[in-house]
Amino acid sequence: MSQILKQARTAAEQENWLEVCNYLRRLPLGKKENSTGELSELAIADAIELAIQVLHQGDFQQRWDVAKLLPKLGQGVVAPLLTILEDEQEDSEVRWFAGRTLGEYEDPAVVLSLVKLLQNPDTDEELATMAAQALGNLGTSAIEELSKLLLPKLAIDAPLVEEQTRLLAVQALAQIRRSEAIEPLLQVVGDRHPEIRTAAIEALSSFHDRRITLILIKALQDPAKAVRKEAAIGLSFRTADLAEFDLVNQIKPLLNDLSIEVCRQAAIALGRFGTDEAADALFRVLKSAATPLVLKIDLVRALAWAETTASLEYLQEGLRWSAPEVCRQIITLLGRVKSPTLKAKATQILIEFLYSGQNATFEATIKQAIATSLGQLGEPQAIEALEKLAGDSERVVKLHAIAALKKLSLSDRESSQPQEKTEKVSG
C-alpha cells in the first residue's frame, strides 16, 4: 500500500495528475468510507492530500475522476473540501467539485457552508445551483437550514437576490422528497413571486397528503399561468381523490384558460381521469369552432387515453366534422387502442369512416392511416376494408393495406396454432 502511495507522490511531484488518479484508484477503498481496514490513518491522510492536489491542479476530467474517489476516503475529506468551498478566491470549477462532493456528507458544517453559498449575492449561478442540488442530496439534515432561507427578509437593496436564494431553497427542498419538507414548502405556496409559487406547487405535487390536494385546487385559480399549469399537472396524478374533491369540475374551467399551455395540461389531466364526465368536457371543447387546432390535437389524444366506450364514441363523432389534421390524429389513436373489448369498436369506427364518403376519406394520407390502424388493431372484420384499400390507385395506400393484411394473416395463424395443437393432442 505504501508503495502505491509512494508512486502516486512521485507522479504528483512530476505534475502527472492522470497517473496520480490511476494510483489512487488502486487503493483498497470502500464504497463510501474506508471500510476495508487495510489503510492506516496516515495512509488515508496521504491519499486525501494527493486527491486535493489533483482537484486543485488537474484538468476537468482528472477533477471529475478524483471527485468520485474522495467520498471513499472517509470523513477526513470534509475539512479540506470546506476550505476550498468557502474560499471566494478559489477557482469556481474547483469550488464546484468540492461542493458537489460535500453533498455526500450529512454533516452540520457542510449544510451551513452550502446554505451560506446560496445566501451570498456574489455566488455565480452554477455554484448556487450546485449548492441547491447538494443540499437536496443531504436530505432531512438540510431541511431546517433550508426552511430558514424561505422566510422573507427586508431585502430592500437586493430583492432579486433574495428571490433567487429562496427559489433555490425551494428547489433543494423539492429534491429531498421527505415528508418533513412539506411544512416549509406549504409556507411559500402563497409567495409574492410566481416563480417561487410554481416551484413549491411542483415540489408538493409529489407528496400524498390531503392538504396538498386542497392547495393544488386553490392554485388552479392563481394569476400566474405557470402556477395553474403545475397545479393541473399535480392533480392529474391524484385519481384517488377524484370523487372526494370533484376534480373533473375543478379542472374543466382550465380547458378555456387564456394560456394554451394550461388548456393542454387540463386536457391531459381529464384524459388521465378517464371518466365519462371528463370525456364529455373534452368533447364539448373539441367541437367548438373557437378551439385552436393545436389544442384539438391534445383533446383527441386525451379522449384516446381515457379508452372508454364513451370516449371512442366522441372520437367517432369528431371524425365527422374535424379538419384533416385532427382526423388523421384520431385515426392513428384508434389504432393504438389496447383494450380487447374496445378493439372491435375502434375497428368498426374506422371502417364506417372509410365508407362514409366524407371528403377526408379521399385523401391518400387518411387512407394510409386507416390501413395502418386497422392492421394494428388486428380484427378480422377489417379484412374486407383492407382488401379495398389494397386495390387503391395510390401506391402508398396499397402498400400499407397489403402490409396490414399480412399482419392480420400472421396474427390469425398464430392464434389458430394453439387450437390445432390441442386438437392433435386430444386426437
Predicted regions and their residues:
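Structural detector for internal amphipathic alpha-helices that build alpha-solenoid repeat scaffolds
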Residues: K6-T10, N22-L42, Q53, Q62-Q75, ...
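Short glycine/proline-enriched turn or capping motifs at secondary-structure junctions
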Residues: A390-I402
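Amphipathic alpha-helical scaffolding segments comprising HEAT/armadillo-like alpha-solenoid repeats
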Residues: S2-K6, E41-H56, Q75-D87, D107-N120, ...
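Short helix-adjacent coil turns
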Residues: Q3, E15-E19
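Short inter-helical turns and helix N-cap capping residues of alpha-solenoid HEAT/ARM repeat scaffolds
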Residues: E13-N16, K32, G58-D59, E88-D91, ...
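Short amphipathic alpha-helical segments
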Residues: L18-R25, E49, A79
